[in-house]
Amino acid sequence: MGSTSGPRLLLLLLTSLPLALGDPIYTIITPNVLRLESEEMVVLEAHEGQGDIRVSVTVHDFPAKRQVLSSETTTLNNANNYLSTVNIKIPASKEFKSEKGHKFVTVQALFGNVQVEKVVLVSLQSGYLFIQTDKTIYTPGSTVLYRIFTVDHKLLPVGQTIVVTIETPEGIDIKRDSLSSHNQFGILALSWNIPELVNMGQWKIRAHYEDAPQQVFSAEFEVKEYVLPSFEVQVEPSEKFYYIDDPNGLTVNIIARFLYGESVDGTAFVIFGVQDGDQRISLSQSLTRVPIIDGTGEATLSQGVLLNGVHYSSVNDLVGKSIYVSVTVILNSGSDMVEAERTGIPIVTSPYQIHFTKTPKFFKPAMPFDLMVYVTNPDGSPARHIPVVTEDFKVRSLTQEDGVAKLSINTPDNRNSLPITVRTEKDGIPAARQASKTMHVLPYNTQGNSKNYLHLSLPRVELKPGENLNVNFHLRTDPGYQDKIRYFTYLIMNKGKLLKVGRQPRESGQVVVVLPLTITTDFIPSFRLVAYYTLIAANGQREVVADSVWVDVKDSCVGTLVVKGGGKQDKQHRPGQQMTLEIQGERGARVGLVAVDKGVFVLNKKNKLTQRRIWDVVEKADIGCTPGSGKDFAGVFTDAGLAFKSSKGLQTPQRADLECPKPAARKRRSVQLMEKRMDKLGQYSKDVRRCCEHGMRDNPMKFSCQRRAQFIQHGDACVKAFLDCCEYIAKLRQQHSRNKPLGLARSDLDEEIIPEEDIISRSQFPESWLWTIEEFKEPDKNGISTKTMNVFLKDSITTWEILAVSLSDKKGICVADPYEVVVKQDFFIDLRLPYSVVRNEQVEIRAILYNYREAEDLKVRVELLYNPAFCSLATAKKRHQQTLTVPAKSSVPVPYIIVPLKTGLQEVEVKAAVYNHFISDGVKKTLKVVPEGMRVNKTVVTRTLDPEHKGQQGVQREEIPPADLSDQVPDTESETKILLQGTPVAQMVEDAIDGDRLKHLIQTPSGCGEQNMIGMTPTVIAVHYLDSTEQWEKFGLEKRQEALELIKKGYTQQLAFRQKNSAFAAFQDRLSSTLLTAYVVKVFAMAANLIAIDSQVLCGAVKWLILEKQKPDGVFEENGPVIHQEMIGGFKNTEEKDVSLTAFVLIALQEAKDICEPQVNSLLRSINKARDFLADYYLELKRPYTVAIAGYALALSDKLDEPFLNKLLSTAKERNRWEEPGQKLHNVEATSYALLALLVVKDFDSVPPIVRWLNEQRYYGGGYGSTQATFMVFQALAQYQKDVPDHKDLNLDVSIHLPSRSAPVRHRILWESASLLRSEETKENEGFTLIAEGKGQGTLSVVTMYHGKAKGKTTCKKFDLKVSIHPAPEPVKKPQEAKSSMVLDICTRYLGNQDATMSILDISMMTGFSPDTEDLKLLSTGVDRYISKYELNKALSNKNTLIIYLDKISHTLEDCISFKVHQYFNVGLIQPGSVKVYSYYNLDESCTRFYHPEKEDGMLNKLCHKEMCRCAEENCFMHHDEEEVTLDDRLERACEPGVDYVYKTRLLKKELSDDFDDYIMVIEQIIKSGSDEVQVGQERRFISHIKCREALKLKEGGHYLVWGVSSDLWGEKPNISYIIGKDTWVELWPDGDVCQDEENQKQCQDLANFSENMVVFGCPN
């Protein structure tokens, strides 16, 4: 810790007498943070020692010193130069695991008979946990594979129990496991299946050692619906900063490469912006389209665009901000798009920054000072080979590869603060733009101004293991004392532990001594060298002089781990091919492997486990805090992470926090048309320039300038400027014809072998594989083991990154550099599928054919294979083949239009073969097909589980109904989740009383027997409270010993007032006092836990109270009243005094019972008599004070049962205090007794308001008349701190009885896992019973998820809403990747008496459409703002949702907004979009309207090829209109297996909606009865998809013959519906006059015969 923490004073408890020469000094040095269950080195040293000195080291618990946690012995003698070490190990006990406060131990060293003792902070960290996931991003329903490496502080494998939790993006734990890494060699391989229905976002795996819950390690992974990209994009600025004066602007290079290494051809859309903290300003004028040719492109942000796009008063206001650039690259084939962003390009005045982070803050006067100057580029990367100079000392140097330059300065011989200014001297940069920085270094403080110094210096080199380092020890001291310094003691710290100690001898006259050090792998990643000497200074006092230096070592693995390819490395790998991997590592190590598709890291490259990340975690746990040195000798040790104590009282300040002190944060100061537009802007001053600029913006609604100006709320000057510029630009626009935007280039298919059956399609496309753990066996002569593995590559054409992490019991953990395996072939298919498509929605997919042959065009036959789960141009009877030419070094997209018919994962397969070559490829991928409609999450119930209070005889029974699924999409599943969570006992929000406020209670007791107790009480209770609440670090750890000495003094003094009968009085000659004696018993019983108390004294007093002062009825009497009435608290009031005195004495007897029961035979009998007396009178007591004190006495005697407890609680005022008017101290005392009583009987529910009231009194004890109140409030609060946070009274047994399961599902909810969300899923929508028993509370939530039908028109009570959509007028400005554009018009008016404030438009886009964000920005950012802001959310189903916020909606005029919407992918049957308007303040006042392009616009039909429409309709019902159907045909088909029913029906009415049509049929004849027990004349609902409306052509009033299969019956009896599907027969049944027509006579006769045959004879089978 630095000088900013701990007491400001160095605790130099120096003796006042000069030391004699040869007077030995003993020192103890330990790390100032000791870790549990970890071996820690303690350094023991004697200076001027003689003979053998036996040293015993003991570690005790702090503060009580009740336990010996570790003990070791050693001997100091001439042989070891009076320097020795012992290793101690602190076991993990439950005291250390409690989460209250920091933990400390007392390390005690006994040198012969000289004791040296130091209190040291304890860390619960048992080691490190590193978590590796197989990928960084996952889709819903996939599996996360992860490994946890369990290592100790040396990074060696350790077998321990760990707790692992999976945490949602909202921070809720949904899975928790306790696992052991024993016998696992430190590697736990685990997995977790992500549910299909899951929250998107950043999930976490959190893990901690079971005995160190505070030290949590975590790894994040993202859950998202995505498709892996086929290429990656990198954005590289030409400079890592933007120089504010640079007239050339900022250029960025765009590099786009396919994952298999080939260059991309496409188009990049680039936009720049400025970032200021969290705020982003997009520079819309910078939007440019850049061609990507052969994988590269270039975009430039000009200085003018930057300055015009931001509204700062001066250019310098931009300094300190940063530039970001967003790039979207689209392939020329249009099949794939990848986004990339580069952020944090700083805007600077100087291209460099100077840091002093690696420089000590203290110097030794007249000695060299090593200034380590760290120079960085503005992005934080090291600036290499930059000249630097110190202005005052003219010392020059050059930065090395790591950006650091060393400048050695000769410091002056004075004690003043030393300012040092460093600047860069880079050629070509003007002086004003060179970087410069000043630091002030302070002189090292010597003891007694002795001017004795030590300075460590070392050469500036990058150290690697195996190299040697010479450290120079420079000495400066009084010449007369130099010869007394015969050696330096040095210590080396690494990873928070003492690694090595030694002595470096010094010969007489040596001013510089060299210590040679060999760097080993133990020194990685850095180490601290601390050195000191000791002498007796001129003033006769013992002095310690110290210095330290922090040394960086090159980060690398401690051991070896290399992954490489075996065999020929130049060979190109092909998909599915076998390859050889060669892995080299340490013998006996285990290595975890994984191969990851590089496309994963294009989407998310965060959270990869690397060796750098491992060292970062280790460095973060370093307990040293500065780059070296210190303000004095103690500061040197403390800042290096060491605790020092000597037998002469010299010591380091107490470290009280595991974290290093944070430095105080510095406060920071905080085209022709375009040209004419800029000229116009220049006519206006800055304050109204924005109004002019917004007047020249385009308006999507085409409002007039006058109408637009009505929306401005910025004053007349703004309106005037707006109107002028608006009208100016309108005239200009009429004169300019706008250029049409360029479209994406498309390759035309040319008109113009291997058989398809012989082509084996590639079908294995995992995102990761090779998830194995291998063991290294026999090593070679160099000690390195090699493992050779033959693996078969997967089918992806990509680059695989093979990652390896090894764990060795000798060399620890090591992460290898990734090994890349490129997989490709000259000709292949890339089949691009979306993440999911909707059943029955027509969609376009693309197969891209790539030809990487050098100079040969390929003639290719490509085929989409038939799959009955889709409608496409491939059918069971006819192949869909195309022939086309793919030019050399190029690609051709082949679009396919399909209609998915079945939900689930369906296969899409495309094959291609090249004419006249033996070349082919095939790809088979799965496409996720989801049901129509919107996913609905319906909360069925939320209930509180509290069996004790809500149940009968402790059993709570909850009947849960099924969800109402009346709007469910037919032929889809629902899933019900039953969620359970415990509710832990509410812990007090308020902190207990701050220990730092109790200093006034530590006081010296004195005076008579009463005064002495008045003085001793506060000290005893303060120590008890600070021990219980673990707050000594706030108070001062060294003060505890002082307090114990005062208690000992008070105890000794009190014995003077002990009379011969063992009782106590104010003076020896006064009558013995019952109250004082009982009070002595109470205080001494508590003090017995702190100091040695003679049990004869304590128990003699107990015996006197029982034998002399207790009457036969149990009451205690007082004959020697106390003189000092201020010590008796609430006893002053004489009302009910027998009860209150008896209760007081009984409490004292109970608290002394553990000590005195063996010595006082009558103790229990006396306690019972007093208890019975109190019980007889308790219910009649009136005084709140007496009720409280007697209640505590009864509780201690197990007698505070229900009627007495009710009496206690009912006496409280507002259930939080026991109050008598005008008696604040008595009320605090009484309430404290009551709190103790409730804690004893564990009535924790009643406790919180009482503790809150006591805390609110902010009563810190002390003052006249406060003895009892002080003692009781701190006794009560200490007991509360002890009991309630550890109170774990939650034990619920919950059983769920589902009708569809044979046995109930059982869960036990305990306090330890209360926050864990337990989940049960069922696919059945059924009611069920839940039974809860036990203690505590929990929450039950039941949520059903299903696909709901799109709702029809809703009634609109408070809003009028009109929505329309029409094609955008040409010419239209649209994104290049957009296929078409339309304009959405929304007009609304509020139907109330005044305007609706804060309203919201919730707009669901049509499938395949997205809004034009530029239009939305215009609507939201102009001074004539029409909307206040908008949010665009990508929903689960390829449908965008747009939220628009409006400040108000008028109640007199229609408010209208218009914006373009662009179609990005083609869908045959476009689902309608919807617009909902509602007021933020009244969510029920909503109105919804749907919108849809009409068929005449061609959007419904333009993709529908004739055969495909036919295919889609064939799945509507069983077709029979192609050929004449005979009677036998009908009989044969109606009697096929699976046919459930045959009816003659009449269509009563049609209910048409936006996705499904309902036909209400009356059953006129049951020709064959099925599983539905329907009667003639009843109505039944027949459901059909809207795509079948035209094919069915059902007419109201018409009669129909209908039959179908049992699987098409839907719902539960009696509400069964019938789905009309491909197995449903629907035939018009002519009747009446129609049958007279000749053409219908045969059909009518056949239908009548069919009906008769079926009814009379039935089916033959």
From Swiss-Prot:
Span of domain NTR: 1516-1659
Modulation of this protein's activity: Complement activation is inhibited by VSIG4.
GO cellular component: a single term: extracellular space
One example of a Gene Ontology biological process annotation: positive regulation of D-glucose transmembrane transport
Subcellular location: Secreted
Region spans: Disordered: 947-969
One GO MF term attached to the UniProt entry: endopeptidase inhibitor activity
Pfam families per record: A2M, A2M_BRD, A2M_recep, ANATO, C3_CUB1, C3_CUB2, MG1, MG2
Disulfide bridge partners, by residue number: 557-814, 625-660, 691-718, 692-725, 705-726, 871-1511, 1099-1156, 1356-1487, 1387-1456, 1504-1509, 1516-1588, 1535-1659, 1635-1644
Transmembrane annotation, as ranges: none
Ranges for region Interaction with CFP/properdin: 1632-1657
Entry-linked InterPro entries: A-macroglobulin_rcpt-bd (IPR009048), A-macroglobulin_rcpt-bd_sf (IPR036595), A2M/Complement_sys (IPR050473), A2M_N_BRD (IPR011625), Alpha-macroglob_thiol-ester_cl (IPR047565), Alpha-macroglobulin_TED (IPR011626), Anaphylatoxin/fibulin (IPR000020), Anaphylatoxin_comp_syst (IPR018081)
Signal peptide: 1-22
Cross-linked residues, Isoglutamyl cysteine thioester (Cys-Gln): 1008-1011
Residues modified as Phosphoserine: 38, 70, 302, 670, 966, 1319, 1571
UniProt modification remark: C3 precursor is first processed by the removal of 4 Arg residues, forming two chains, beta and alpha, linked by a disulfide bond. During activation of the complement systems, the alpha chain is cleaved into C3a and C3b by the C3 convertase: C3b stays linked to the beta chain, while C3a is released in the plasma. The alpha chain is cleaved by the serine protease complement C2b component of the C3 convertase to generate C3a and C3b following activation by the classical, lectin and GZMK complement systems. Phosphorylated by FAM20C in the extracellular medium.
Keywords on record: Cleavage on pair of basic residues, Complement alternate pathway, Complement pathway, Disulfide bond, Fatty acid metabolism, Glycoprotein, Immunity, Inflammatory response, Innate immunity, Lipid metabolism, Phosphoprotein, Secreted, Signal, Thioester bond
Residue stretches of biased makeup (Basic and acidic residues): 947-960
Glycan-linked positions: 937, 1615
Self-association and partners: In absence of complement activation, the C3 precursor is first processed by the removal of 4 Arg residues, forming two chains, beta and alpha, linked by a disulfide bond.
Function according to Swiss-Prot or TrEMBL: Precursor of non-enzymatic components of the classical, alternative, lectin and GZMK complement pathways, which consist in a cascade of proteins that leads to phagocytosis and breakdown of pathogens and signaling that strengthens the adaptive immune system.
Name of the protein in its database record: Complement C3
Source organism of this protein record: Sus scrofa
UniProt gene name: C3
